């Protein structure tokens, strides 16, 4: 395969994703989102061909002619068409990669629909979770992508906080970012709830007032 070795997206994939999967034996991999470039598909398929695995790629656009390999099954469907997709998948998967609709509600839906298929100690990776490159005056500078990725980032933190005994969560900020969830348990995930933080508590207000006056006193004494 002729994989393009340029770009931060590839660097992110090689450094944050690939080390988790490169030595999997006979891996069963589910990928949501192919795209015209098909970079992740090419890398994952190369792995499956070398390690006697199977790659299941799902996309609403027809990329079925992109590759010709006995190790690849293309599923021409929406990623949330679970009833159909599930009939083509094995009972358990070694890796899931999501790169389709980058909105918090959709990411949560796909995670909850397919997470139970993942083997324990295996990974579910979600691409595009950093809003920073899309902020004003940054290289991508895009309002909707900034907001979508911001909401997705914090939604994943809420999901983790509600399920911290069932998963680990890591983030990469290379390129447009990615989240890596490691499954720790076969227990069913529960829906996220608000985090009971104390940012807006009366105690924190007193802390801020105290810090403000301490700073004023220090400046006055200087």
Please report, for each region that a protein language model flagged, where it lies by residue.
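A short alpha-helical cap/connector motif
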Residues: 1-97, 101-222
């Amino acid at each position: 395969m002729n994989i393009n070795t340029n770009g931060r997206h590839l660097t992110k994939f090689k450094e944050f994703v690939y080390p988790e999967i490169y030595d999997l034996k006979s891996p069963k991999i589910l990928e949501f989102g192919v795209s015209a470039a098909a970079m992740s598909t090419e890398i994952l398929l190369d792995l499956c061909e070398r390690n006697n695995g199977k790659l299941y790629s799902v996309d609403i656009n027809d990329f079925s002619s992109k590759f010709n390999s006995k190790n690849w099954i293309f599923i021409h469907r929406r990623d949330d068409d679970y009833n159909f997709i599930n009939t083509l998948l094995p009972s358990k998967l070694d890796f899931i990669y999501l790169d389709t609709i980058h909105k918090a509600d959709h990411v949560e839906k796909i995670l909850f629909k397919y997470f139970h298929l993942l083997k324990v100690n295996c990974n579910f990776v979600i691409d595009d979770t950093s809003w920073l490159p899309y902020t004003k005056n940054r290289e991508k500078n895009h309002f909707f992508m900034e907001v979508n990725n911001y909401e997705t980032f914090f939604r994943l933190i809420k999901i983790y906080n509600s399920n911290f005994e069932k998963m680990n969560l890591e983030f990469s900020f290379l390129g447009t970012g990615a989240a890596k969830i490691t499954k720790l348990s076969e227990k069913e995930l529960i829906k996220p709830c608000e985090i009971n933080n104390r940012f807006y508590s009366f105690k924190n207000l007193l802390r801020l007032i105290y810090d403000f006056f301490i700073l004023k006193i220090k400046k006055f004494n200087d």
